[in-house]
Design a protein with these regions (language model features):
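Sequence-pattern detector for short linear motifs
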Residues: 7-9, 38
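Sec/Tat signal peptide C-region and signal peptidase I cleavage site
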Residues: 19-27
Length: 149
């Protein structure tokens, strides 16, 4: 009997980890802190990208661009209705009032990071490309969807 229970637990465990991440399984605190951590990681990586590009270390910057792109895609799942308040969120209500616009901006930011990674190989003005494909998305989102801090 104990052997059957162990097998059942193993099957349940394997089954549960084989599904993609779902914010629905997380608490409000975990979701809010998780999205804040991803945005913070994106900002830290964006600053690193600036330094790397200034030093002409283009290939070292590309994995950071991919990571930022991936985070933006993940963030689409980190704004359920029950996470509008609490845990020092800086998210404005406009996110939920204009969910399609917000999601489109997150998707655009993700797509633009991939474009950025490709464009830096041939761009003459790296700062201009960085401003257009990275920083402009940060500015657009912060001005519309993030509380002043």
């Amino acid at each position: 009997m104990n052997q059957k229970i162990k097998i059942l637990h193993t099957i349940i465990f394997i089954f549960s980890i084989s599904f993609p991440f779902s914010a629905n399984a997380m608490t409000v605190e975990e979701i809010i802190k998780g999205r804040k951590a991803m945005f913070s990681e994106n900002y830290q990586n964006a600053k690193k990208i600036s330094i790397l590009l200034k030093s002409k270390k283009i290939e070292e910057a590309k994995p950071l661009m991919k990571k930022i792109s991936d985070n933006y895609k993940k963030l689409l799942d980190y704004f359920p209705e029950n996470t509008k308040e609490g845990f020092k969120t800086e998210a404005r209500p406009s996110i939920w009032e204009n969910k399609d616009e917000f999601n489109a901006l997150m998707q655009k930011a993700s797509d633009d990071m991939i474009k950025f990674a490709k464009a830096i190989d041939t761009a003459e003005d790296l700062r201009a490309v960085q401003k257009e494909l990275m920083w402009s998305n940060c500015t657009a989102c912060h001005s519309r969807f993030r509380a002043p801090h």
